[in-house]
């Protein structure tokens, strides 16, 4: 249980497909705890193992009242044709934001800490965060999907209006 240092945005691990978890053991539990500690330290909404330099297909999403969503080897099984464009950012790319179009609804298969398959359906912001994390696990940063990267003035205007 340690706050880990984030890797720099140019680190090669952020641009490669991450290895699936194959062993559900104490090391995985420690990784999940490290991710949780780092997530809260960074005041982030989500974090993936490659963002702390770990080549394992694991991510966490803070769903606020519902708690933390653990994603282990997540795979999108289906997604809606209906999409929504919204602003995204990443703790890997501080102060950079872009508009990204993503499906409004998704169904994902993942695994729990014991290796049991779990299927979940997510909507709106949670679906967006899951897709963003799965992109991280596939070596895709949100800037590759963004149809518009905001300049400093646009970012200030956006956050002033929230």
From Swiss-Prot:
Pfam families named among the record's database cross-references: Pep_deformylase
Molecular function terms from GO: peptide deformylase activity
GO biological process: co-translational protein modification; translation
Gene3D superfamilies for the chain: Peptide deformylase
Disulfide bonds: none
Database matches in NCBIfam families: PRK14595.1
Similarity comment: family membership: Belongs to the polypeptide deformylase family.
Protein name: Peptide deformylase-like
Originating species: Staphylococcus epidermidis (strain ATCC 35984 / DSM 28319 / BCRC 17069 / CCUG 31568 / BM 3577 / RP62A)
């Amino acid at each position: 249980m340690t706050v880990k240092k984030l890797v720099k945005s140019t680190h090669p691990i952020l641009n490669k497909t991450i290895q699936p978890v194959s062993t559900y053991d104490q090391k995985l539990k420690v990784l999940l705890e490290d991710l949780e500690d780092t997530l809260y330290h960074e005041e982030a909404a989500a974090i993936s193992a490659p963002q702390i330099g770990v080549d394992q297909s694991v991510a966490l999403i803070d769903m606020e009242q519902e708690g933390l969503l653990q994603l282990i080897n997540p795979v999108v099984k289906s997604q809606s044709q209906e999409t929504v464009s919204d602003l995204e950012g990443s703790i890997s790319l501080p102060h950079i934001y872009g508009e990204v179009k993503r499906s409004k609804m998704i169904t994902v298969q993942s695994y729990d800490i014991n290796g049991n398959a779990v299927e979940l359906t997510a909507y709106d912001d949670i679906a967006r965060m899951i897709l963003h994390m799965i992109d991280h696990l596939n070596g895709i940063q949100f800037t590759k999907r963004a149809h518009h990267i905001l300049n400093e003035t646009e970012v200030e205007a956006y956050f002033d209006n929230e």
